[in-house]
Design a protein with these regions (language model features):
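Rossmann-like NAD(P)-binding element
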Residues: 54-86, 90-91
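Short secondary-structure boundary/capping segments
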Residues: 58, 107, 133-135
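Rossmann-like NAD(P)(H) cofactor-binding subdomain of soluble oxidoreductases
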Residues: 76-130
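Short beta->alpha hinge that forms the Motif I/post-I loop of the SAM-binding pocket
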Residues: 32-33, 70, 95
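NAD(P)+-binding Rossmann beta1-loop-alpha1 motif at the extreme N-terminus of oxidoreductases
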Residues: 1-61, 65
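Interdomain hinge/lid region at the active-site interface
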Residues: 205-272
Length: 280
């Protein structure tokens, strides 16, 4: 089977490397960045390149698996551009961390039977093909979501992909996915950016000289790809706003406790410590 990866960034590049390492599948890639393609070819991370996406309509790529591994908004545009392959022998999946906008496109096209949504829960604050790894997905969870219209053979091909990368498959519907990740991933990144904004206001003070490991770890998320996270914040706006409202309410509760009732803050922090130990 041929696997065509669209987008050779951290995720796409890592999929390619791990497939080359673990399987005998033929791995091809398309990327608008010729340097990324050249590096992947020179490093034997892919077997060949795709010059343009129209090539994928040829018989040469029948029964292949296409993995869209670009930032979320670009993924939506690419998916639309591949509409001629909907309901074909080609299997299409993605890696986006937002699912409902993708699902809406599928419904718009009468729910094609060959498209399965994927979200590997793996990554790094370092982006780009140059930071890709041949073990990024090892032992990591991957969310897989398929509409009822999808044929079982296409689901199996996507499952084979993630099993080849030694990932753990979890099935989850798009609505639940976007709600959960607004809290578990998108909000923490937003808070990291907010802390950095606060530090920017204090740039006359060299805070980093007086910081411990937790400080750097907290800010690490803000080193992630601005393009990708701008897309995520925008596309998951409703869920993120709800999560952010709750977060702000809790910040205000902590602020009030600090100012008005020092004993209460101790009790609150103790209960939160217990909750964390029992759940996370």
């Amino acid at each position: 089977m041929k696997v065509i990866i669209i987008g050779l960034g951290l995720i796409g590049g890592s999929i390619a490397k791990q497939l080359i390492k673990n399987t005998a599948l033929q791995v091809f890639a398309y990327d608008s960045n010729s340097i990324s393609l050249k590096n992947a070819l020179n490093n034997s991370s892919i077997h060949g390149e795709i010059d343009n996406l129209d090539q994928l309509n040829s018989k040469e790529y029948e029964n292949s698996l296409i993995v869209i591994a670009t930032p979320p908004k670009a993924s939506l545009e690419i998916l639309r551009s591949l509409h001629s392959l909907f309901n074909s022998s080609v299997t299409i999946t993605d890696t986006s961390s937002i699912k409902l906008p993708v699902e809406k496109i599928l419904i718009e096209f009468d729910s094609p039977n060959n498209i399965i949504l994927s979200h590997p829960i793996a990554g790094s604050h370092n982006s780009g093909e140059q930071n890709s790894l041949d073990s990024l997905f090892l032992g990591k969870n991957v969310i897989v979501s398929a509409l009822p219209s999808v044929n079982e053979e296409h689901i199996q091909k996507v499952n084979i992909l993630w099993e080849s990368l030694e990932s753990n498959i979890i099935n989850l519907d798009s609505k639940t996915h976007d709600h959960i990740f607004a809290h578990s991933s998108h909000l923490p990144h937003l808070v990291s950016y907010a802390l950095l904004m606060t530090l920017q206001d204090l740039n006359k003070e060299n805070i980093s000289e007086f910081s411990g490991g937790g400080f750097g770890e907290f800010l690490r998320l803000a080193s992630s790809s601005p393009e990708m996270w701008a897309d995520i914040f925008s596309l998951n706006q409703e869920n993120l706003n709800s999560s952010l409202d709750s977060f702000i309410d809790n910040l205000n509760q902590l602020k009030n406790s600090i100012n008005e009732d020092p004993e209460n803050i101790k009790s609150l922090l103790t209960s939160l410590k217990i909750f964390k130990e029992e759940n996370y």
